[in-house]
Regions:
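Conserved phosphate-chemistry cores used by DNA topoisomerases
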Residues: 5-217
């Protein structure tokens, strides 16, 4: 169920891929509806690292997402009868942004999505259309200001800067529990968010993670 954007011009349009309906609610409220669309990924995502194309193209989560992206797939097989062959001109978005919780489960879901994209539409990664939205790990509040730390090192620097002031520190909640204002500031507003552009070399790290995860099971 895509929550679309108002803008028709591809050069600014962004697709946020989020995990589940709970995240959909907060991201929907935080987005700029003019150019940001949101699609939730529901249920367990297929691990495309090992799955054959027959299984991949029977997975509704994957086929729905590919249809929303719009450019088809770079796979020559009779298994993808409902999806067109790849044509970059049909891509509907300037940025495809994966937005998951800042925890182990969120990292795993992100890895599964990246692996799926690299298996079916590697050109999108090679040409720089795929991004990850960083979510803060900590929210640090003093009497007059709120800070967001995206890792332990940033948390240490912020606490050092605060010095002897009283502060409250909270570890990040799931995206669905965050207020829309915080989501906009830290994850969606182009002026203040942090996006990581995915490079082809990053996929090797994703593959290593998935192999390790499968080994532990």
């Amino acid at each position: 169920s895509l929550v679309g954007s108002e803008m028709c011009i591809r050069d600014r349009r962004e697709l946020y891929i989020v995990e589940g309906d709970s995240a959909l609610g907060s991201v929907k409220m935080a987005r700029n509806a003019e150019f940001q669309a949101v699609i939730p990924v529901r249920g367990k995502i297929l691990n495309c690292l090992k799955a054959d194309y027959d299984k991949i193209f029977k997975n509704e989560i994957i086929t729905d997402l590919i249809k929303v992206i719009g450019c088809g797939v770079e796979v020559k097989t009779g298994k993808n009868k409902e999806i067109s062959m790849f044509n970059l001109d049909n891509l509907r978005w300037n940025k495809i942004v994966i937005c998951t919780d800042a925890d182990v489960d969120g990292f795993h879901i992100r890895t599964l999505i990246l692996t799926m994209l690299y298996r079916l539409v590697p050109t999108l990664i090679e040409k720089g259309y795929v991004y990850i939205a960083e979510s803060p790990l900590f929210e640090i509040t003093t009497s007059d200001k709120t800070y967001f730390a995206y890792d332990e090192n940033e948390k240490t620097k912020i606490l050092k800067m605060i010095g002897n002031k009283k502060f409250d520190i909270q570890r990040s909640k799931g995206l669905g529990e965050n207020e829309a204002e915080m989501m906009s500031l830290t994850t969606m507003d182009p002026a203040t968010r942090r996006l990581i552009k995915i490079e082809p070399d990053d996929i090797a790290v994703s593959y290593t993670h998935l192999r390790a995860h499968e080994t532990r099971r």
